[in-house]
Amino acid sequence: MTTTISQRKNRAAGANPLQKFWRKRRGDILPPIFGILGFLLLWQLISSAGLIKLPPPSSLWTDPRTRTLLMYPFYDQGGLDKGLFWQTLASLGRVAQGYSLAAIVGISTGILVGTQPLLDKALDPIFQFLRMVAPLAWVPIALVALQQNQPAAIFVIFITSVWPILINTTEGVKQIPQDYINVRKVLRLSPQKFFFKILIPSALPYIFTGLRIAIGLAWLAIIAAEIVMSGIVGIGFFIWDAYQQNYISEIILAVFYIGAVGLLLDRGIAYLQKLIAPGQ
């Protein structure tokens, strides 16, 4: 009996790290997998029964054009004839530019407004008004003002995603505990030390909340903008072009790409928050 118990312990100690990970995380991994498979199965049954006119998920493989897009995401024939990897990458490039600009402007302006109550009262109605404007409403304004698709698309991303960053940063600065302000006065901290030791750490949870909301809005905005703007490489224009040619399976495939990339972007910001501000 003692030998058997000892052997079991040795086997457990020498278990494959992958097996340990599976035993630890299978409760988190299996439910989403079953949920996704159940959704796809239900969709397949409803489409096959003719209850909806959308093609079933199996059409992503049975349709020759969509199967080619699945198997060759990196193909590039020049112009607009590119695989979905390059279409998605082009959209992500625009998102990176517009979102980065929004983060810089939103955080810096939010800190300024949050530390100046009079400025906050003066500008908050403007911020709240502008953030209610839908991304598509900015597209014609951006095209008229900038005259080019690429700068107009970046502007639409910026103007859509800057508001949650700015407003959440402002709120985070305003929520700094009064005790911290008193400590600053007692210790006579310099503005630089107050900024890095008190203000930024206190406001970080609010800033990252704004950043997570903004990355989703930025991704939605570029899809909407590219659908309206013709003749540019991007996942949004790819969807519109497929719709014009009635390639519904291609639209569904692109929607899967959009959802997957959006999820990865959100998880990326959440992971960045854990690295920079663990435990907050």
From Swiss-Prot:
Q: MF terms per GO, please?
A: nitrate transmembrane transporter activity
Quaternary state and partners of this protein?
The complex is composed of two ATP-binding proteins (CmpC and CmpD), a transmembrane protein (CmpB) and a solute-binding protein (CmpA).
Induction record: By carbon dioxide-limited conditions, probably via CmpR.
Q: Where is the ABC transmembrane type-1 domain?
A: 88-266
Keywords linked to the UniProt accession:
Cell inner membrane, Cell membrane, Ion transport, Membrane, Transmembrane, Transmembrane helix, Transport
Protein name as catalogued: Bicarbonate transport system permease protein CmpB
Q: List the disulfide bonds.
A: none
Q: Can you tell me which family this protein belongs to?
A: Belongs to the binding-protein-dependent transport system permease family.
Location of this chain's protein in the cell? Cell inner membrane
